[in-house]
């Protein structure tokens, strides 16, 4: 938690001035009851209008000064809280970018979004309230009691009895409701997670006619949240009547003692008014203090969750520069797996077991296998999205772990299964591959990816807007643009992870032909469920339950690999493979 306080270092001045100005405001507030008592005891008693007007002017001046101090304190506290949350959000976002796929899988997207938004907002609100009240409320409670004793020590003894009783009620309710508020926050996170899941998968929900099921699921979670919030609300609502009962009893006692003191000449009627005002000030500040503790408790709980993400160490350590030289006997290697195994965190069984193969520069490597056979797991090791649990992965003759992050990702570009585009334009999306690429290079990549024709047909061409997630493009168009984006970077190794699934056979064949015709020694890994897409590959890796059960050309595998032959025959009979 101390690490998170470091983000306040740029706002030390504001963090000091905010509570100080609040204490100044409280100081002026403490003088108000005395001035009011003076008006009653002197001005009204003597029927001195001038005296009354002067004291009213003093009250107005105190109000203006107090308001100025309050606004100044609010400005500084808001500046510190907003600046702190902004710095924290930037740091958290930057830290998330440094996490590997493994940590992202463990934490979960919904969790990270909640930490970035509602949790940091809660921390901001708690800090803002803390800076304004953590000194003011105790100062007013103590100050009001001291001022009460200056008015009349005997009557002020009622404060000595009332304040502990008020504290027991206020803080007792707080102690009871604090863990319940945490439970309510957990249930709120659940509702937010369900909402995000539903909105993300809204098309699937519609496709399977599951709207009512989703409504029922949401209502169940929302009902649990509502019940908890109502329960907490009912308990918190007890605070107001109980405290006002104590205050009213104390006020009655003050009036009784005050009347006796007035009769014997021990105090004036204005002093009773001052004591009642001090009692009300104490009540208000105790309620504020209890609310502050509840809000700060929520903020600390949220801060703890944010800190847990910040404490998550990136699982991959990238060197600052290349660590090794390429041996002469490996100069022609593009990718080499040497007895590689992979087990995901929390998984009981390995996803890959004892995989060994070598892909030469310029080769096209096909990867095929049934669902869950480990195809994506295998290609995700090449750009080092994950580290192998056992064995060694070598890229262009060097261990993958010897490359700096930028160097490795510059040499290996991946087109994921899900075609992900970002809001902007076609040009801005393509420039992710190489921010310095010229228009000629962009069009060349589009042509290779079989996307030039439909981009040229757009009214604005490269500057055609792309909505968030590419909502205004078809599945095939998005896939071709993501392939073009990868090609813009001119990588040494290109991985197509089932990223042509939305393309028809003709377009798929044209894409493979265009990739083969590219100059240089581009090595292409094609992950596909279609045997037809891989039959012209230089090598085909056949995976089954995480194991490499076949390695060779299409013709070789048909003779030697039963798994490949089964896949081929099943698709051929369905007309999914062309001879």
Describe the function of each predicted region.
Residues 32, 36, 73, 77, ...:
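Hydrophobic/aromatic residues in alpha-helical transmembrane segments
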Residues 1-31, 36, 44-60, 65, ...:
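Membrane-integrated ABC transporters
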Residues 48-54, 147-161, 231-305, 309-310:
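Helix-loop-helix
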Residues 46-47, 82, 90-114, 118-120, ...:
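Short intracellular "coupling" helices and adjacent cytoplasmic loop segments at the cytosolic face
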Residues 327-579:
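ABC-type nucleotide-binding domain
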Residues 10-13, 98-102, 118-127, 131, ...:
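An intracellular "coupling" helix at the cytosolic face of ABC transporter transmembrane type-1 domains
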